UniProtKB/Swiss-Prot annotation:
Subcellular compartments: Mitochondrion
Classification via SUPFAM superfamilies: Ferredoxin reductase-like, C-terminal NADP-linked domain, Riboflavin synthase domain-like
InterPro entries linked to this entry: CysJ-like_FAD-binding, FAD-bd_FR_type, Flavoprot_Pyr_Nucl_cyt_Rdtase, FNR_nucleotide-bd, NADPH_Cyt_P450_Rdtase_alpha, OxRdtase_FAD/NAD-bd, Riboflavin_synthase-like_b-brl
GO biological process, one term: homocysteine metabolic process
Similarity remark: Belongs to the flavoprotein pyridine nucleotide cytochrome reductase family.
Major location category of this protein: mitochondrion
Domain of life, per lineage: Eukaryota
One Gene Ontology term, aspect cellular component: cytosol
Name the record gives this protein: Uncharacterized FAD-binding protein C1783.01
Pfam families: FAD_binding_1, NAD_binding_1
Start and end residues of each FAD-binding FR-type domain: 162-424
Keywords recorded for this protein, A-Z: FAD, Flavoprotein, Mitochondrion, Oxidoreductase
Gene Ontology molecular function: [methionine synthase] reductase (NADPH) activity; flavin adenine dinucleotide binding; FMN binding
């Protein structure tokens, strides 16, 4: 019995409208479909209006042995698409779906795995949702859904015993000028009522956590894609977990029974936007996809050996769960199993940009809005920076309108352990050089304030600040030699160099390090001299380290091997001459 028929030459198919999408994605592939007789093949040819060449093909595969009639093995260029003719309409619909077209998925990349898929195993189901057995389930009074003062459920515990504190916003400043590539803001928060434990304080150079929510628009959009009625989002459910820390973040590892709603789970506990879907999650989506073609593509994406298309999903187009659901509309995963497979929505950490000991219970922080584009080209912002910008703009608007006194603006934040490198290794003596790019310069503002206010300080301070254009995005311009509300030590002055990458010299901070290598070497050679480095990306750090090695070779007369060894010594805890914070 003939079970599969192969078409050797697909060039004749290109004239058929129904096969344009197939030829587009499989230009060198043959077609295979399931038939039980020659008559069935002929009927299907007439039904689908296929060329007669299909009937004349001499290439038949044997279902039981996987061989092609007339040869020992199929041509290497052939790709077997299971039951293609049966699913021709579904394939065309998938390829014509604009959401699918926007994804960086090439069906030709999947061809080598399709005949023998090894999909990722299904993720375990750790969560169940039910209806409360009591008529009046307890209400979490901590929750606030106010757009300007949002607060998560009480079970969200990013750092026990510290709860999440609603810190009032006292002031907002825009640090960049119109025309800057990125927007950067400075927030001033009131921490006078923060419940600090005995013996704890806020450290200069420290960082604190912010618990951002997913936006209501994103939550409602996800619910729409999952076919969840909007009113169902707000119905109180019994959430049971079989172990782990979720949804508390860092609470005790144990089973839980909580009263909550899908709205609060999606808003505060599940990260479905900032990270690409894992293969485990894609496998779950494939399991609950009705359309056979969509199911096959998702299964192929979850294959252990599939790297090309999946890597593009992770690195090129910022693909999210909603993007996948839009591209594969027949996918309807169970909500409880989906929640089990989604990562926890985690807090974001921000450096303190002032000296807390001089600020009268006020913390300042700077943030740059992270922007990227969705697969279809729409602009998106990072979960936390987008959330903070919305708060900042609403605050500025209320202040402009004169309605600030009637509104409450708060940020959900918590102290954390204050054990980041800058908090542990700030020293108030000896010369220091502060090197930062972009918003990485923010924690050094507090360093300089501490030095300027210290009457006994005689150590010199050098600042190398990297930006694109000094006129547009130099942060804290004119603030580096002042201490608000305090007298400045006249003997101490910070010397600052602004490095522009798109104007002036068009150089980067590592170029300035080499150009001022004599100053850098003087700092490193001093007994108490230290260099602090802050920025984003490992490439930033590696370039600075290369520049420091060049300085050591030029001014310290060291060989390359000796400079490499010295670079490692500077970073050892016992020496602590090069302190880095990178994100």
């Amino acid at each position: 019995m003939i079970s599969h028929v192969l078409v050797k030459d697909t060039s004749c198919l290109k004239v058929r409208t129904s096969y344009k999408c197939f030829v587009k994605y499989f230009p060198k592939c043959s077609v295979q479909s399931s038939f039980h007789s020659y008559d069935e093949l002929a009927f299907s040819r007439r039904l689908y209006n296929l060329p007669r060449t299909l009937l004349n093909s001499r290439y038949y595969s044997n279902h039981s042995h996987g061989l092609v009639h007339g040869s020992k093995s199929p041509p290497s260029s052939q790709f077997l698409v299971p039951s293609f003719l049966q699913f021709n309409g579904q394939l065309k619909a998938l390829c014509n779906n604009s959401a699918f077209q926007a994804l960086p998925i090439k069906l030709s990349d999947l061809q080598k795995h399709w005949p023998s898929l090894k999909p990722h195993p299904l993720p375990p189901k750790r969560v169940s949702l039910g209806i409360p057995s009591i008529s009046n389930p307890p209400v979490d009074t901590v929750i606030s859904d106010s757009p300007t003062s949002p607060h998560p459920p009480s079970f969200v515990q990013p750092h026990p015993p510290y709860g999440i504190f609603a810190a009032p916003i006292l002031d907002v400043r825009v640090l960049t000028n119109p025309g800057a590539v990125k927007r950067t803001y400075n927030l001033c928060l009131d921490i006078s009522k923060y419940p600090l434990l005995e013996g704890k304080d806020w450290k200069i150079g420290g960082s604190f956590g912010i618990m951002p929510p997913n936006s209501d628009a994103e939550v409602l959009h996800l619910a729409h894609l999952l076919k969840i009625p909007q009113h169902e989002l707000y119905v109180t459910k019994v959430l049971r977990t079989n172990g782990g820390r979720w949804p508390t973040i860092w609470g005790e590892d144990k089973p839980r029974c909580l009263y909550t709603s899908l709205y609060h789970i999606f808003k505060w506990c599940s990260d479905f936007i900032s990270k690409p879907p894992t293969k485990s999650l894609i496998r779950l989506l494939a399991e609950h996809t009705l359309n056979p073609v969509e199911k096959s593509v998702l299964l192929a994406l979850s294959d252990f050996r599939q790297d090309e298309s999946y890597c593009r999903i992770c690195t090129q187009s910022c693909v999210t769960l909603p993007d996948i659901l839009e591209a594969f509309p027949s996918c309807h995963p169970p909500v409880d199993h989906l929640i089990s497979a989604l990562p926890q929505l985690m807090p974001r950490w921000y450096s303190i940009s002032n000296d807390p000991s001089l600020a009268n219970k006020r913390l300042e922080m700077a943030f740059t809005v992270q922007e990227y584009h969705s697969p279809n080209g729409q602009s998106r912002t990072g979960i936390c920076t987008g959330f903070l910008e919305d708060l900042a703009l609403a605050f500025l608007k209320a202040r402009h309108d004169g309605s600030l006194a009637n509104k409450k603006f708060t940020v959900p934040m918590f102290r954390g352990v204050q054990q980041n490198p800058f908090a542990k290794e700030f020293h108030n003596d000896g010369p220091m050089c502060l090197i930062g790019a972009g918003v990485g310069i923010a924690p050094f503002r507090g360093f300089v304030q501490r030095r300027l206010a210290n009457a006994a300080c005689t150590g010199k301070v050098w600042i190398i600040q990297g930006c694109r254009d000094q006129k547009l995005d130099e942060l804290y311009h004119g603030e580096w030699n002042t201490v608000p509300g305090h007298h400045k030590n006249p003997k101490c002055r910070a010397k600052k160099l602004v490095v522009e990458s798109r104007n002036g010299r068009r150089e980067y901070v590592q170029d300035a390090v080499r150009r001022h290598g004599d100053v850098i070497w003087d700092v490193l050679s001093h007994k108490n001299g230290r260099i602090y480095l802050c920025g984003s990306g490992n490439s930033f750090v590696s370039e600075i380290e290369k520049a420091l090695m060049d300085v050591a070779m030029k001014y310290g007369k060291l060989s390359k091997e000796e400079a490499q060894k010295e670079l490692k010594n500077w970073q050892k805890p016992m020496n602590c001459k090069l302190i880095k914070e990178v994100w």
